[in-house]
Amino acid sequence: MAWQRPDGRLPYELRPISFYPSFTRFAPGSVLARCGDTQVLCTVSVNKGVPKFLEGTGKGWLTAEYRMLPSATQKRQERELLKLSGRTQEIQRLIGRSLRAAVDFEALGERTLTVDADVLQADAGTRTTAITGSFVALAHAISKLLQEGVLERSPLCGQVAAVSVGLLEAEPFLDLNYIEDVAATVDFNVVMDQHLGIIEVQGTAEEGSFSRTQLDQLLDVAQKGIQELLIAQREAIADWESLFVIN
């Protein structure tokens, strides 16, 4: 029997996605990203200076941190204080790698952009929502730096969005919620740029294996969702046309 989605969505349908820019006061870029019941607060801060391996090169850097509010899930989780879990470290590296694909670091100069993605509520897809929302926050931060004259030209040279896909009852589904994520026999996180080029694919089978045909189906479904997310991102960035130097 075919999988029936708990929220009534079609197999290739995204959850409702929305961005609330300028959500906090002090960070140059801040966005509350909502994907269904998943909510992630994404902020971008800017500091002079770069890691030692970049000093004197004239190039900037972008790094990311990811955390979950203890009450983001149904059962309260302990705060990660002295040591980060392997999952947290993996996710924040993924966010950083993904967003670095959209930045011209020579245009940024010797400055460091720090992305903070804090999950307020989790219903699966937190890392993909963090990437998609953090890109919007990054664009707003760059816009502010340009307006203030800190930067002479925009270092944004690309656009990045991410989505989850999975196999349920051997069929591909887009943007899994928690119930679906638990039930999926295969689940993927896919990150793409504005040309639908692949930045990263994370995919595993929870039991057994999956075929090359199913892999292609999952990537096709992910591409469809990312096309919609790219449009939603642009609609949340008022000065899109002047801000981006897209190759």
Curated annotation (Swiss-Prot):
Keywords: Nucleotidyltransferase, RNA-binding, rRNA processing, Transferase, tRNA processing, tRNA-binding
Enzyme's top EC category: transferase
GO biological process: rRNA catabolic process; rRNA processing; tRNA processing
Gene3D superfamilies referenced in this protein's UniProt entry, alphabetically: GHMP Kinase, N-terminal domain
Matches recorded under InterPro entries: ExoRNase_PH_dom1, ExoRNase_PH_dom2, ExoRNase_PH_dom2_sf, PNPase/RNase_PH_dom_sf, Ribosomal_Su5_D2-typ_SF, RNase_PH, RNase_PH_bac-type, RNase_PH_CS
Catalytic activity: tRNA(n+1) + phosphate = tRNA(n) + a ribonucleoside 5'-diphosphate
Role noted for this protein: Phosphorolytic 3'-5' exoribonuclease that plays an important role in tRNA 3'-end maturation. Removes nucleotide residues following the 3'-CCA terminus of tRNAs; can also add nucleotides to the ends of RNA molecules by using nucleoside diphosphates as substrates, but this may not be physiologically important. Probably plays a role in initiation of 16S rRNA degradation (leading to ribosome degradation) during starvation.
Stated family: Belongs to the RNase PH family.
Name of the protein described by the UniProt record: Ribonuclease PH
Species whose genome carries this gene: Nostoc punctiforme (strain ATCC 29133 / PCC 73102)
Lineage, highest ranks first: Bacteria, Bacillati, Cyanobacteriota, Cyanophyceae, Nostocales
